[in-house]
């Protein structure tokens, strides 16, 4: 019932521990559930809206960046039924915090075994003292822009080195046959699969927005099998083991399910290629 003494509060017994939990911000019809990092930061009419793509995972969710001046203040999902529908992962939504408050904005040098903040002058002086040769390596981060990586390449070449790396995992992907690496069924098509085999992928963390589509497929009767370390799924799934050797001799129920399937789907993660 409603009355003057009624209070609306949080449900304290269970926290919303989910990689898509912040979508309640978009679902709330009255604005009572708000984006805490963005709250009281700006008015909507002050913001410049830029259409973009989420780069926090390989899914490529459609997003909108709201900025004021040079500062990005919030990230919102854009509707694209073929990719992310109207959803956005918490990782993508709140990565805006790392653009301003929690980022490396100065060089660091290792002195006496410890990393210490330094000025750009000190950093460039340290680089200038490096003896030219093949012992110098340049490692680029996952989120670096092309201009910065090109500058790093020129610096390495000037130091007489060709040791360049931009893959944090060290994996080498063969792109000669793109059909082998693309999600060739389309993301929306995964919902119609009748058997799903997931190899080396923690889908909930690696592609959070894809996981609800797998759940839809499972609710429609699809059988889900996973090769890799166990993780907490949101749908019934059978874990076959964390060794790729399992693929050489799959259990009988798995082979029979794959043989009878009309729309089987295979999802291979980066861990499957290590």
Positions of predicted regions on the chain:
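Catalytic alpha/large subunits of respiratory electron-transfer oxidoreductases
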Residues: 14-17, 21, 25, 32-274
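C-type cytochrome heme c attachment motif
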Residues: 5-9, 23-27
